[in-house]
Amino acid sequence: QILTIDMTKVANVILYMLHKQVKHLSDKKVAIMLFLMDYNHLKFCEKKIFNETYVKGARHPEPVIVSELFDIVANEEDLEEDDERIFLMQELLDYLDIEVIEKEKFIELNFIKMEEEFDETLFDKDELRTINKVVNEYKETSSRNIANDCFKIDIVRTTPKGEIIIYIWFKFL
């Protein structure tokens, strides 16, 4: 299940957000933005962009695999060489440098663009439209306020904490 996520798309969407000068672009904001992109895309196009699974966290929806990778970076954990998360981590680090910033009560990750440019050919035009819509809507917003917006979404509000946020769409023909 772990290798189904499209890390190249995740890395590229972070590059796109850096290019668009999204404010307060920490690991937390990236996590919430990924959820909103997948949620919106699923709602309107009936498929996810990143193939990630999201769980309801205490403060916001958490992308399971991406959050795990961010925790590994934040805690400077060493992975065994046969750990498949190494491949995902490498894919992310091929595109971005990640700066670990120790705050008083938590660790924050900031993303730094390297040589790689955003590759829009990885996304179809509907995906680009969804990504652009979410980025434009939340470009200036703090992660706390975006998280609050997530809790206005019924499926997020009604899912118990720690459970997978399941999307069920009924099509009436």
Spans of model-derived segments:
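Domain-edge interaction signal
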Residues: 1-173
